[in-house]
Design a protein with these regions (language model features):
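Single conserved hydrophobic/aromatic residue that forms the stacking wall/gate
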Residues: 1-7, 11
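Short amphipathic helix-loop junctions that connect adjacent transmembrane helices
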Residues: 12-27
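Residue-level signature of mid-helix packing/kink "hotspots" within the transmembrane helices
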Residues: 36-40, 44, 137
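Helix-to-loop junctions at the C-terminal end of transmembrane segments
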Residues: 42-55
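C-terminal ends and interior cores of transmembrane alpha-helices
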Residues: 65-78
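Hydrophobic core of transmembrane alpha-helices in multi-pass small-molecule transporters
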Residues: 81-98
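A membrane-interface helix-boundary motif in multi-pass transporters
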Residues: 145-177
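Intrinsic disorder in cytosolic terminal tails and internal cytosolic loops
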Residues: 189-206
């Protein structure tokens, strides 16, 4: 859920990035519009990718694309075609992640039942919701602290170099760090390979 809340927090920080780094706060609507359209369209192709490559690999692909998209935006220099490319890449990445994340959560419920004999949908879903809220809370707190340390002044005509750096840290580098952590965690996720056998065993028990 940390990955999901990191993605959510990115949207909160976009206004700072668009206004002070890209130089036009109105770019937020363009960035979000392209991102959302691509993400929605991408959802229609995820089932096909999951069938061929598995949930873990598609989710990991989404994280990699999110990282690439953030880096492309970071080095866009406000050049609109590159910003569009970044939004497309991140839209595809979020489609991969959003479509597979909850499916993997559902798989862990089946795994828990197979391992312990108890099916705990409520507990698992509550834990996910709690983790999402905690992640959002931490992200919002970090945003305020880092901007304050960087000397960000909301109504300033121009921000200092340290303030601009703090915005980049919040909008680009912290989400990238979370995505990298997600990739590391996925290295230890092997349920895709075992899941058919687990479902067959559960069916046999019932």
């Amino acid at each position: 859920q940390g990955v999901s809340s990191a993605a959510s927090d990115v949207y909160k920080r976009q206004v700072y990035y668009a206004k002070d780094i890209l130089g036009d706060k109105n770019l937020v609507s363009t960035i979000n519009g392209i991102f959302n359209i691509v993400q929605i369209l991408g959802m229609f192709f995820i089932a096909m990718l999951v069938k061929k490559f598995g949930k873990r690999n598609v989710f990991s692909l989404g994280l990699i694309l999110d990282i690439i998209g953030m880096l492309v935006l970071n080095f866009s220099g406000g050049f609109m075609p590159i910003i569009v490319v970044s939004s497309v890449i991140r839209g595809i990445g979020n489609a991969c992640g959003g479509a597979t994340m909850w499916a993997m959560v559902s798989d862990t419920i089946d795994y828990g039942e197979w391992k312990t004999g108890y099916r705990t949908e409520g507990l698992v879903n509550s834990a996910c919701s709690f983790g999402y809220k905690i992640g959002n809370g931490i992200g919002s707190a970090l945003l305020g602290v880092i901007l304050e340390v960087g000397g960000y002044v909301g109504n300033a005509a121009a921000q200092t170099a340290s303030a601009l750096t703090s915005i980049k840290i919040c909008f680009v580098w912290i989400p990238i760090a979370v995505y990298v952590c997600g990739l590391i965690i996925m290295k230890f996720y092997h349920l895709d390979k075992e899941f058919d056998g687990i479902l067959a065993d559960l069916k046999a028990r019932k």
